[in-house]
Amino acid sequence: MSLVDLGKKLLEAARAGQDDEVRILMANGAPFTTDWLGTSPLHLAAQYGHFSTTEVLLRAGVSRDARTKVDRTPLHMAASEGHANIVEVLLKHGADVNAKDMLKMTALHWATEHNHQEVVELLIKYGADVHTQSKFCKTAFDISIDNGNEDLAEILQIAMQNQINTNPESPDTVTIHAATPQFIIGPGGVVNLTDETGVSAVQFGNSSTSVLATLAALAEASAPLSNSSETPVVATEEVVTAESVDGAIQQVVSSGGQQVITIVTDGIQLGNLHSIPTSGMGQPIIVTMPDGQQVLTVPATDIAEETVISEEPPAKRQCMEIIESRVECAEIEEREALQKQLDEANREAQKYRQQLLKKEQEAEAYRQKLEAMTRIQTNKEAV
């Protein structure tokens, strides 16, 4: 049996999941060949869900990232069909989790397209990039939304947030450059974290006010920076425990002698403060508002001055970038569609030329046949 025949039989055995036949053929020297589409034995085993055959081929040294004519890898095949166990064994053997096919789609795209939640979770676990866009400018999250799969959309959204959140510090922070009493401002009130006897809070009322007014009240409520260790701040309202602080209040972050107060204001109206002991504050406070503005407040003893620095919100910038990216992708798709139509027209023209040539050859053969018959008839008549 020739090597070509051995290679063909290996492809058939891998497609059928015949482990013993695969071993025998490889022992007899069957090459790791492919079919006319570039499909290898490992592609077929992964596509048809033959786990043990996949392991046999991987141990034998078949390329784990082999490509078909459309650049699909065995991982693409397994993910598209929902074979989670084969996806995992391929990844354990070092398959490229972010490999892209001709449509620039990864295994995560295909698993999402076919609603294979277990495979999606497995790919994310092994480091699949959830932000990768296909040739059609679609992420896996976009595909899940298009398919109406809310469970997958939630999983992918969480994964996207986890991969983006590389900076642990919140952008909406207030930094005080001194060893001041530590406060948290949230919907539950202004909480003093330095009181050894407990955590004291000043409750907010129901009337609406700005974050700036709240910070001014905080400046009055806090002790002087130079004497912060001597005079703890205690509000005139009720004393609460740390467990009663609202869960939405962010934690104070200390770094390099700085205290960072994070104010949670999205969707919450802060009310007027109740009675608070008045005392000075020796340092200004810089607040980054949720809409991207930065406001500088100074103590009441200094000249009151506000400096508002407006900048484009990050969300708006990101939205504009997405829109520009999609417009660019749409233009690329249009050019590619036109090129595809041109190529198709050229192929049709070539096809008609070949058909015409064939007809001409047939006509010539028929003419010669008629001439031969005429000569034979003439000879008979002459005799």
Swiss-Prot record:
Pfam families: Ank, Ank_2. The keyword Coiled coil does not apply. The modification N6-acetyllysine is found at K69, K340, K369. The modification N-acetylserine is found at S2. Its main location: nucleus. ANK repeats lie at residues 5-34, 37-66, 70-99, 103-132, 136-166. Changing K69R: Decreased acetylation. GO terms for biological process: mitochondrion organization; positive regulation of transcription by RNA polymerase II. PROSITE patterns: ANK_REP_REGION, ANK_REPEAT. It is found in: Nucleus. InterPro entries: Ankyrin-SOCS_Box, Ankyrin_rpt, Ankyrin_rpt-contain_sf. Transcription factor capable of interacting with purine rich repeats (GA repeats). Acts as a master regulator of nuclear-encoded mitochondrial genes. Heterotetramer of two alpha and two beta subunits. Interacts with HCFC1, causing repression of transcriptional activity. This is GA-binding protein subunit beta-1. It comes from Mus musculus (Mouse).
